[in-house]
Structures are given as structure tokens and as C-alpha cells.
A protein has these predicted regions:
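Structured catalytic-domain cores with a bias toward divalent-metal coordination
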Residues: 1-261
């Protein structure tokens, strides 16, 4: 199994990307494979894109986003590779956001160019990026599951957060088993200060008690979906390992949910 590189110390010091090149790949693949692509309402000069591909006979609807932290390059690369591979099941409607923080990547910063952590802005909407993203999300129909692609520079392996307030069927454990074949799973009992088991965290605190909301909170609290997976690849590992882990996780979640339909 692949080992960590040992480069991260106090932050992410691994391989970086030119986000404009990754988005160019993503947009080219979307055009080639018949996706509808639009700029977020009010995005201005920011390259904030929403993509959709609707199934003619829908069995499952899925929302996927990434690139909200500029020091987490694996997610945008993974989504670009999935669009290029075009291996999505034909009976799944998909709504994608390929990069939510385009100004963070040039400086390899978690925050945007103005110093705002966008993934803590989904309650008060102070940033233009999140305000524009909210406008796009609010115009979407409800979807069955949401998948947010992230990375963690401190993680010992792959892990995820599951938001599932109604305790409906979730595929977290089976997905982790699939990912474990390509990337180590973080087996820590505490991850980011929260209880975890086998790489799975299920937050129990009410979002109403949190003054700052991540993207997943907004989506679930506003009933766009009642099941959200936030995937965290370990960014101290080589880029191909992290990308493979995220792609495997997304593919597994979609297949596992389709199997229950």
C-alpha cells in the first residue's frame, strides 16, 4: 500500500495544480460528452461553473462539488478525470460544481484571495463565491445524495463525514471498504477532534448550534438533500493515490445507491 510522503508540516506542501488548466480539461470533457454548463448567477468575472446532465429515465440524482479549499487540489483533478472517463450510469442525473474557490488555488491557500474560508460561509453568505453558489443551488431540484470532495493535510488516511438526519440508507461503510483497496483508511478514534470509527464520522451536534456553516450543512438544512457525504482524501499521499481514492468513492456511492432502487 502507498505510504505518505511526509511533506505536510503545518499545512499542505504537496503537488499543486494550475486550476485554469484543470478547469479547461473539465469544460472540454463536459462539452464533448453533452453536459449543460452555466456560470453561477452573479459570478461576475469568477470562473464559477455549474454543470448538469439529466437522465431520461432517472433512478438517482446526485450532486457533486469540489475545489472549495485552494490547498486541496485532488478534488478538482478527480472530477476532471471522471468527466473525461464519462463512465457515469445513464440513469443518474448529475449536478456538478468543479471548483468553488478558483482564487485560492494560485496561492495554495485554504481561503479565497480575500482570506475567507468559503466552507464556513454557508450561513451568512459574505463572500461573492458562496453567494453565487447559493443562487445556483437554490435553482436546482432536490437530489437524492450530495457528495463533497475534500482533502485533509493532517489525515493518516481517507475518511468521510456523513450527514444523515433521518437515518436513511447510507453507503458509507461499503464505500470505505472499496476505497481501502486503493488508499489507506484513517483508523484514528478522533479525527479533527471528533469521534470516528473506521474512517467514518457522523456529527451529532445540531447545525443550529454552529455559527459558521459548511456547504454540506446548507444543502441538508435547506432540504436539497437529506443525505450528504463529505469525502476527505489524505493529502500527504501521492496525488494519484488521492485522486484514485476520490474517484473510487464517488463511483462506489453511486453504484451502491443505485443498487437499492
Amino acid at each position: 500500500m502507498t505510504q505518505p510522503l511526509g511533506k505536510n508540516d503545518g499545512g499542505y506542501f504537496g503537488e499543486t495544480i494550475r486550476i485554469s488548466d484543470v478547469l479547461e480539461r473539465t469544460l472540454a470533457a463536459a462539452e464533448q460528452h453533452g453536459w449543460s454548463v452555466e456560470l453561477f448567477p452573479g459570478a461576475g468575472e469568477l470562473p464559477l461553473y455549474g454543470m448538469r446532465r439529466l437522465a431520461k429515465r432517472e433512478r438517482l440524482s446526485v450532486y457533486i462539488s469540489t475545489g472549495i479549499h485552494g490547498d486541496e487540489p485532488g478534488g478538482p483533478v478527480a472530477l476532471a478525470e471522471m468527466l473525461e472517463a464519462n463512465a457515469w450510469p445513464s440513469d443518474v442525473s448529475l449536478y456538478l460544481c468543479p471548483c468553488l474557490n478558483p482564487t485560492g488555488f494560485p496561492g495554495n491557500t485554504r481561503e479565497n484571495l480575500a482570506g475567507i474560508d468559503l466552507n464556513r460561509d454557508y450561513r451568512h453568505f459574505k463572500s461573492p463565491e458562496v453567494t453565487a453558489h447559493k443562487a445556483w443551488i437554490d435553482g436546482l431540484p432536490e437530489f437524492d445524495i450530495a457528495i463533497c470532495l475534500h482533502e485533509d493535510w493532517e489525515a493518516k488516511g481517507f475518511y468521510l463525514y456523513e450527514l444523515n438526519p433521518e437515518k436513511q440508507f447510507a453507503a458509507s461503510e461499503a464505500m470505505l471498504e472499496a476505497v481501502g483497496a486503493v488508499c489507506p483508511i484513517d483508523q484514528s478514534e478522533l479525527i479533527d477532534g471528533r469521534p470516528a470509527k473506521g474512517g467514518l464520522l457522523r456529527p451529532i451536534a445540531s447545525p443550529d448550534a454552529r455559527p459558521l456553516w459548511p456547504e454540506a450543512f446548507y444543502i441538508v438544512q435547506n432540504n436539497k438533500t437529506r443525505l450528504s457525504y463529505t469525502l476527505e482524501a489524505p493529502s500527504d499521499f501521492p496525488m494519484p493515490t488521492r485522486v484514485d481514492a476520490l474517484c473510487t468513492a464517488v463511483k462506489s456511492l453511486i453504484e451502491l445507491h443505485l443498487a437499492t432502487r
